[in-house]
Amino acid sequence: MRRITTIFAALLMAASLPLSLSAQGGISADMLKEISKAYEGNANDKAIRNALNTASISVLAENAENMAMIDTHFSDEVRTKGITDQKSSGRCWLFSGLNVLRAKMIDKYDLPSFEFSQNYIFFYDQLEKCNLFLQGIIDTRGLSDDDRKVDWLFSNPLSDGGQFTGVSNLVTKYGLVPSDAMPETFCSNNTSAMSSLLKLKLREDGLRLRSAKGSMKQLLAMKEAMLTEIYRFLTLCLGEPPVSFKWTRCNSKDEIVSVKEYTPKSFYEEFVGEDLENNYIMVMNDPCREYGKVYEIDYDRHVYDGHNWLYVNLPVERIKEMAIASIKDNTAMYFSCDVAKFMDRNKGTLDLANFDYESLSGFTFGMDKSERVRTHASGSSHAMTLIAVDIDAESGKPVKWMVENSWGPASGYKGNLIMTDEWFNEYMFRLVVEKKYVPADILKMFESDPVLLPAWDPMFSPEN
């Protein structure tokens, strides 16, 4: 009897513990009375409250002292033509990567304008990512359902976001076609509904693969049947990728230069022809991790038989050196950043002085870049194409930069965004640069073994 009483008392004590903790850590009536004094209801509070009832915070926080447009002159600028538009999709990584190649092709062949088919590469991106997920499920079939990697796979079966490794892997494997050989469709421009159905199907297929008891050969046959269904659905949504096509090349005077039949691979080899897998490196400014080290993100790739995302972490000033060298040589770069921070979309500027949130809210915001990353307050969210820098003649230091965006020509400054150098320091994260612009000491860093980071590391979400 004594034992039963003791157990009952212990259960009562355990049951009361959360309530006790809640009482100590909760907002009491006295605390509420005290903190409510912060709102004084004076003329200043009333004016701000009235304004916030009828207008957005971003509009009211616009800094009147910074309303003048940033000077649009740049000392060095890559020659480009035209602005692309990813519409309502997360394909910025693809547009940025192809825009780097597009600028080179327009300049080299004196084209009036040109776009590669983003839809063509996107078709294979989605097919390859579906295979990546399904094969990942097969590879982890011996792990429990609550294993971190299994949970991550089912939480992230598919995305339309990505990064430059996807561009290099997919273009190398499947080639390229002009935009008119496989034009955009409603589903490529508006990916949400298509992605939702694919993710639902992948999760169902993933469960089937995990519960299957067959041999590896049988599992691979199941996966192939699943991919057959997915290929059909992608074709319904995006169209079927061309096996061959005819392309008429004209110069900037609109004179026909050639008319020729191509395959996607022969078109890529003739007009791009560079080794995307080995000619470029990715550098990153992540102040939370040690500089001078190479990092690899496990399972962060677009193609199962491709390679993981690999980068070297560098101080921002070293990254600027390479960016300036590339721009001066008329070569655009894949660039990614936390684009929404302090962005004036109407003017097309990224400037720390665009908005004065502190005066409006009464808050102070003092976190540095490292602290923002560590607390999930900042991270790379969008990829664009770095095309210009303005260097001060006296100091030799950059004053501002310009990126070609993929939100259409009506967005920002003629389809571009202009950023101050101070904004670059705080919110730039990744740059992909050709090796010929990279100093020897940085190239040597890639000879060391990379530090392997897990796929679920919060710093490495896909760029959209």
Q: PLM ranges: what are they?
A:
Residues 25-82:
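N-terminal regions that are enriched for targeting/export leaders
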Residues 88, 96-97, 101, 163-172, ...:
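Stable alpha-helical elements in mature extracytoplasmic
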Residues 94, 120-123, 169, 178-181, ...:
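Structural recognition of the beta-strand scaffold that forms the well-ordered cores
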Residues 70-140:
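Post-signal peptide N-terminal segment of secreted/secretory-pathway proteins
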